[in-house]
């Protein structure tokens, strides 16, 4: 029996929600280990659609759900989400949801700063969701953040808020924004403290006990490897490490506790917001893929940019993240296309390269080298076995496996969780 870490292998929006829910039903514990409420995922359970941003996917299935120390938590957004799922019949209690007591809090000032910076940047903006995730991580690294455990001691909270505002008010002055009052922020935090503190827990200890008891643990990542702050298309990235090895750090467990690492991978490529995208399509095929795949952000509603499958990027994600298999999603979106292209390399300054360079300028200048495969006419939608797939679809899948150097462990053929072909069980690896 193995624990499993699930991460995106592209720029996020790969369909992690469905795959995580499929695995969560079989897990005992589900853990979020990075990110904030900037990345949403959609689950369909018994015909009911849930849209989650902070809550682990196991929460809607009654599993022990954990928000790890690597997550930045907006308390107000959290309770909005808890109230939203409660209206759908899912009750979240401190017995079922544990939040790391050392998790950093996102405060209203973080969102304000995020949006002010984006507005000031003009055409050079990164394309953040404006929800304060980046500024909260900045405060964490600078050792001035407010953590969940700080809400339990008013004296400590006041000292830390005043210290925090010394920094933030200087930034706000520089942006021409009004300064913040410490008393107002402290009052807001003390008001929400009795609601969120019952969820606070030493989650590293909870996870250690679960591991010793032989419980199956599912580590749930947000965004995707190409949005990783170190390994992604910097600076057009998120503010945390999204690759699989961070599951251990962001949850408070040893690396050996993670087990099987599964990369969720679309059968094509999408991206939201600014940043390089070598295989982006600007023609009718790109628009067709976007319409068929319903490519709009769960949180932002922004249309996603669409393009051909980039095997160079995914192979890089496999190698950097130590992915042992992928879950291939949205294959059905490609049904009926006459031909399909796969990016197998890049051309840069006349040279052929097999990776995405780190330089922002070089990333924007690489040209994709394509291999063309014949498409298939029969539908793959809802297929539940390899026998249901067209031969040319199987050929496409096998070629992807060769190029990215990782096998397909799961194949998703519709948003419904039952429409999944299991090739290799991650929990039994």
UniProtKB/Swiss-Prot annotation:
Mg(2+) binds at residues 13, 40. It catalyses: IMP + L-aspartate + GTP = N(6)-(1,2-dicarboxyethyl)-AMP + GDP + phosphate + 2 H(+). IMP binds at residues 13-16, 38-41, 129, 143, 223, 238, 302. InterPro entries: Adenylosuccin_syn_GTP-bd (IPR018220), Adenylosuccin_syn_Lys_AS (IPR033128), Adenylosuccinate_synth_dom1 (IPR042109), Adenylosuccinate_synth_dom2 (IPR042110), Adenylosuccinate_synth_dom3 (IPR042111), Adenylosuccinate_synthetase (IPR001114), P-loop_NTPase (IPR027417). The keyword GTP-binding applies. Pathway: Purine metabolism; AMP biosynthesis via de novo pathway; AMP from IMP: step 1/2. Its cofactor is Mg(2+). Belongs to the adenylosuccinate synthetase family. Plays an important role in the de novo pathway of purine nucleotide biosynthesis. Catalyzes the first committed step in the biosynthesis of AMP from IMP. This is Adenylosuccinate synthetase. It comes from Rhodospirillum rubrum (strain ATCC 11170 / ATH 1.1.1 / DSM 467 / LMG 4362 / NCIMB 8255 / S1). The gene is purA.
């Amino acid at each position: 029996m193995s624990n499993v870490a699930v991460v995106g292998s592209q720029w996020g929006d790969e369909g992690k929600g469905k795959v995580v829910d499929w695995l969560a039903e079989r897990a005992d514990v589900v853990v979020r280990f990075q990110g904030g409420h900037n990345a949403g995922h959609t689950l369909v359970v018994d015909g009911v659609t849930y849209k989650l941003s902070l809550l682990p996917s196991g929460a809607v299935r009654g599993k022990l759900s954990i928000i790890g120390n690597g997550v930045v938590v907006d308390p107000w957004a959290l309770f909005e989400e808890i109230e939203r799922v409660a209206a759908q019949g899912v009750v979240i209690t401190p017995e079922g949801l544990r939040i790391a007591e050392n998790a950093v809090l996102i405060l209203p000032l973080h969102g304000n700063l995020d949006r002010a910076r984006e507005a000031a940047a003009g055409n050079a903006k990164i394309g953040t969701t404006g929800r304060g995730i980046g500024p909260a991580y900045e405060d964490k690294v600078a050792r001035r953040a407010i953590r969940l455990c700080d809400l339990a001691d008013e004296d400590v909270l006041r000292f830390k808020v005043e210290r925090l505002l010394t920094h933030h008010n200087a930034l706000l002055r520089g942006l021409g924004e009004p300064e913040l009052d410490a008393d107002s922020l402290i009052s807001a935090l003390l008001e929400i403290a009795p609601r969120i503190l019952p969820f606070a827990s030493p989650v590293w200890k909870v996870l250690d006990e679960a591991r010793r008891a032989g419980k199956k643990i599912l580590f749930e990542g947000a965004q995707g490897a190409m949005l990783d702050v170190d390994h992604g298309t910097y600076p057009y990235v998120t503010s945390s490490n999204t690759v699989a090895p961070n599951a251990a750090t962001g949850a408070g467990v040893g690396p050996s506790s993670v087990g099987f690492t599964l990369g969720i991978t679309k059968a094509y490529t999408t991206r939201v917001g600014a940043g390089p995208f070598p295989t982006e399509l600007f023609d009718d095929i790109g628009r067709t893929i976007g319409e068929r795949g319903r490519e709009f952000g769960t949180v932002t509603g922004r249309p996603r940019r669409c393009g051909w499958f980039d095997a160079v990027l995914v192979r890089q994600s496999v190698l950097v993240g130590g992915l042992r298999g992928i879950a291939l999603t949205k294959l059905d979106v490609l049904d009926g296309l006459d031909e399909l292209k796969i990016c197998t390399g890049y051309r840069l300054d006349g040279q052929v390269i097999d990776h995405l360079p780190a330089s922002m300028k070089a990333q924007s200048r690489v040209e994709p080298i394509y291999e063309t495969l014949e498409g298939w006419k029969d539908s793959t939608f809802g297929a539940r076995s390899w026998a249901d797939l067209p031969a040319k679809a199987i050929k496409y899948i096998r070629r992807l496996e060769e190029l990215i150097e990782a096998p397909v462990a799961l194949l998703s053929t519709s948003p419904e969780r039952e429409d999944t072909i299991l090739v290799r069980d991650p929990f039994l690896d």
